[in-house]
């Protein structure tokens, strides 16, 4: 019975001791700090104590706070993008919004005659004012953004008329820039490469001059909603002085503005970037005109080759004709198949005609020579003194002798060492004088020989003179 009260008394003493210990810790905090120092401060508390000590010890090394870590207002909130409907143009329901444009041409990459297009890389900049994007600023500084903000606000919907391919450069990121002034003025710039159509006239090719245009227009907004204009007039177009092309000389760049009408939608403002190109002729002189001229001159060589040298004259004529055909085919392969005659076609085909006529000239000479040889054979058969002689021994009857030379044979006297064949020819010609019929046969025979020689002789003068005259007329018209 006495054990139960003693147990209760012991429990009471333990509880009272725990209360006293708790009260002592609450009234003596320095002791707790002292005890924690023995076990070690927590990591965060030690860092804070170290920083405070560093600031107190070296105030010179004290750094300003990093503003990027402080909470800032988002650009979307500053521009109040969520408070407006940017699917509508600025000033909707009012007058047309003016949008200025300027362009800097970076490069003119290529001109294709076959596809009738050109490729250009340029910086396209738009200027307009959108009061919905105005923001308060104490220093009147603009804000610059990349392409991510462009998708959240209104921008002009420009496109290139008659473009075949175009893209915005994206290396290393999208080449798009947006700059907003505190009063709401916006600059929108992007770097674009576009391939556009260019209607070319090749009637004077390769002595031609081409004018191409890059046309810029709003796709959806008519002139009642958007007024498109060159911001600085002709100064709105800037070009790099280093721009050059292999086959063309860039003569000038200039700008124009016109209105375009579509029956379904109405009138639109359209901006033009016009540039004039003049073709370099030196390349075509080396590749086309000089080879064609040389082939024509080479065909004239046959006029100085003996008419009996068939293996020499025929291959020469065929070679020049085939070479001219190859030149014509090569030029037309690099050109579009137009339905009109080009200047180079006139020159090449006239040259081809000259080469072909030289072949026909030899065909005529060879034919007349063959006919003449047949008549010679008949004449030898009719002459009694030469009928038994072989053809080489009748060379005295060659047409190189005139009538006077033939008559002089009457006075011919054989000298020592003279062959008797020549004497027989002399006697034959002398006997012909006593017969009027044989005299007429001899005259027609000699005249025939002179005519065949005259074709080659006159061709040596007529062909070069006619070709030189053609060149004078051609270059005076097209140059």
Curated annotation (Swiss-Prot):
Matches recorded under PROSITE patterns: NEUROTR_ION_CHANNEL (PS00236)
Covalent S-S links between cysteines: 198-212
Extracellular side: 22-280, 335-345, 479
Compartments reported by the entry: Postsynaptic cell membrane; Cell membrane
Activity regulation details: Inhibited by TPMPA, a rho-specific antagonist, when forming a homopentamer. In contrast with other GABAARs, rho-1 GABAAR is not inhibited by bicuculline, when forming a homopentamer.
Predominant location category: membrane
Glycosylated position list: 140, 234, 274
Membrane topology: Multi-pass membrane protein
Annotated Gene Ontology cellular component terms: chloride channel complex; GABA-A receptor complex; GABA-ergic synapse; glutamatergic synapse; intracellular vesicle; plasma membrane; postsynaptic membrane; presynaptic membrane
Region (Disordered), start-end ranges: 32-55
Annotated Basic and acidic residues bias: 45-55
Signal peptide (from-to): 1-21
InterPro entries on file: GABAA/Glycine_rcpt, GABAAa_rho1_rcpt, GABAAa_rho_rcpt, Neur_chan_lig-bd, Neur_chan_lig-bd_sf, Neur_channel, Neuro-gated_channel_TM_sf, Neuro_actylchol_rec
Molecular-function GO term, any one: identical protein binding
Biological-process GO terms, alphabetical: chemical synaptic transmission; chloride transmembrane transport; gamma-aminobutyric acid signaling pathway; modulation of chemical synaptic transmission
A Pfam family matched in the record: Neur_chan_memb
PANTHER family: NEUROTRANSMITTER GATED ION CHANNEL
Annotated domain remarks: GABAARs subunits share a common topological structure: a peptide sequence made up of a long extracellular N-terminal, four transmembrane domains, intracellular or cytoplasmic domain located between the third and the fourth transmembrane domains.
Similarity annotation: Belongs to the ligand-gated ion channel (TC 1.A.9) family. Gamma-aminobutyric acid receptor (TC 1.A.9.5) subfamily. GABRR1 sub-subfamily.
SUBUNIT field: Three rho subunits (rho-1/GBRR1, rho-2/GBRR2 and rho-3/GBRR3) coassemble either to form functional homopentamers or heteropentamers. Rho-1/GBRR1 subunits can also associate with alpha-1/GBRA1 subunits to form a functional GABAAR. Interacts with SQSTM1.
Protein name in the entry: Gamma-aminobutyric acid receptor subunit rho-1
Source organism: Homo sapiens
Higher taxonomy: Eukaryota, Metazoa, Chordata, Craniata, Vertebrata
């Amino acid at each position: 019975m006495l054990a139960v009260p003693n147990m209760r008394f012991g429990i009471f003493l333990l509880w009272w001791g725990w209360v006293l210990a708790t009260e002592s810790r609450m009234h003596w905090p320095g002791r707790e700090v002292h005890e924690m120092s023995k076990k070690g401060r927590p990591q965060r508390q030690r860092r804070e104590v170290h920083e405070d000590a560093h600031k107190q010890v070296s105030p010179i090394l004290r750094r300003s706070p990093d503003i990027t870590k402080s909470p800032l207002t988002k650009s979307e909130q500053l521009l109040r993008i969520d408070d407006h409907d940017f699917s509508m143009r600025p000033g909707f329901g009012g007058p047309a919004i003016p949008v200025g444009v300027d362009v800097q041409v970076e490069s003119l990459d290529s001109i294709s005659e076959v596809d009738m297009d050109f490729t250009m890389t340029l910086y396209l900049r738009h200027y307009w004012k959108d009061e919905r994007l105005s923001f308060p600023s104490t220093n009147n500084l603009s804000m610059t953004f990349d392409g991510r903000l462009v998708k959240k606000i209104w921008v002009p919907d420009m496109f290139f008329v008659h473009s075949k391919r175009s893209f915005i450069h994206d290396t290393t990121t999208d080449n798009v820039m947006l700059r907003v002034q505190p009063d709401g003025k916006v600059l929108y710039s992007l770097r674009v490469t576009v391939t556009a159509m260019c209607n070319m006239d090749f009637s004077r090719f390769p002595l031609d001059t081409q004018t191409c245009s890059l046309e810029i227009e709003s796709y959806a907004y008519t002139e009642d909603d958007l007024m498109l204009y060159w911001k600085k007039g002709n100064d709105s177009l800037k070009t790099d002085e280093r721009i050059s092309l292999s086959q063309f000389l860039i003569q000038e760049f200039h700008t124009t503005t016109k209105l375009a009408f579509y029956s379904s939608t109405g009138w639109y403002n359209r901006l033009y970037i016009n540039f004039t190109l003049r073709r370099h002729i030196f390349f075509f002189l080396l590749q086309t005109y000089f080879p064609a001229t040389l082939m024509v001159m080479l065909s004239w060589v046959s006029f100085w080759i003996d008419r009996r040298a068939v293996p020499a004259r025929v291959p020469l004529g065929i070679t020049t004709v085939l070479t001219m055909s190859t030149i014509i085919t090569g030029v037309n392969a690099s050109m579009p198949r137009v339905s009109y005659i080009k200047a180079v076609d006139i020159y090449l085909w006239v040259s081809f005609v000259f080469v072909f006529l030289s072949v026909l000239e030899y065909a005529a000479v060879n034919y007349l020579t063959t006919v003449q040889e047949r008549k010679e054979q008949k004449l030898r058969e009719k002459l009694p003194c030469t009928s038994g002689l072989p053809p080489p021994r009748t060379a005295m009857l060659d047409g190189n002798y005139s009538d006077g030379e033939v008559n002089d044979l009457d006075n011919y006297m054989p000298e020592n060492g003279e062959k008797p064949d020549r004497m027989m020819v002399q006697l034959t010609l002398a006997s012909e004088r006593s017969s009027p019929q044989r005299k007429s046969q001899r005259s027609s025979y000699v005249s025939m020989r002179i005519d065949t020689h005259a074709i080659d002789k006159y061709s040596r003068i007529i062909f070069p003179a006619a070709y030189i005259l053609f060149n004078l007329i051609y270059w005076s018209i097209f140059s």
